[in-house]
Amino acid sequence: MTRVVLGSASSGRLSVLRNAGIEPLVVVSDVDEDAIIAAHPSAPPDQVVTALASAKAGEVVTRLSHSDAADAVVIGCDSMLLLDGKLCGKPGSVDAAHRQWQTMSGRSADLVTGHCVIRLHDGEIVGNVTESSGTTVHFGTPSPDDLSAYLATGEPLWVAGAFTLDGLGGWFIDRIEGDPSNVIGVSLPVLRALFERLEVSVADLWSANGR
């Protein structure tokens, strides 16, 4: 039975997979994201997030036990917000998140997520596929008090673009165009397509990784 491994610490990505019938093994990736971004100074946004996703999945593969790597698919993802031609990652501080919201309030931007799925059999890589997906997010304009309160929760500090769709930040999203799971950090339609390329059935994954 094929084990699903999620190479991410994101509670949002974990929730998406759980709600879709899969309880993955979580192995948090350990890569230097800044170095990877710096190595792609002129690359298009989709290539940057895909490179990050590939690095994360590849790093996780190296740390799997023999039993976990016997029959598995390893998922790596990375999301960034494309606004005014610039990729925005996790703000990391209240001040940075506040500046981000000042820039994007009342505007639209694209949340771009890179996906990588690596297929393992008997500890060997037998498939490696990638894809990116974009969803347009139309932001509302939170009042100064609401924004301050939101920033104080800490939620937007460690997520791409300083917002969540599936959390408190959802109050300040007017609408989206595209796949909502992509905004949360892992697109189910993209994953399904990647699994199909690897000849892996979603139904089989439900059976092997069901909650």
Swiss-Prot record:
Disulfide cross-links: none
Coiled-coil residue windows: none
Cofactor or coenzyme needed? a divalent metal cation
Tell me where on the tree of life, at the top rank, the source sits: Bacteria
* Major subcellular site: cytoplasm
Mention any Pfam family matching this sequence.
Answer: Maf
InterPro entries documented for this protein:
ITPase-like_fam, Maf-like
Q: Does the keyword tRNA processing apply?
A: no
Subcellular location, record wording: Cytoplasm
Q: Which EC number applies? A: 3.6.1.9
**Reactions the enzyme catalyzes:** a ribonucleoside 5'-triphosphate + H2O = a ribonucleoside 5'-phosphate + diphosphate + H(+); a 2'-deoxyribonucleoside 5'-triphosphate + H2O = a 2'-deoxyribonucleoside 5'-phosphate + diphosphate + H(+)
Presence of the UniProt keyword Nucleotidyltransferase in the record: no
Catalytic site positions? 78 (proton acceptor)
Q: Which GO terms describe its cellular component?
A: cytoplasm
Q: Which UniProt keywords apply?
A: Cytoplasm, Hydrolase, Nucleotide metabolism
Sorted alphabetically, the Gene Ontology BP terms of this entry are: nucleotide metabolic process
Gene3D superfamilies documented for this protein: 3.90.950.10
In alphabetical order, the GO MF annotations are: nucleoside triphosphate diphosphatase activity
**Similarity comment:** Belongs to the Maf family.
Q: What does this protein do?
A: Nucleoside triphosphate pyrophosphatase. May have a dual role in cell division arrest and in preventing the incorporation of modified nucleotides into cellular nucleic acids.
This one is known as Nucleoside triphosphate pyrophosphatase
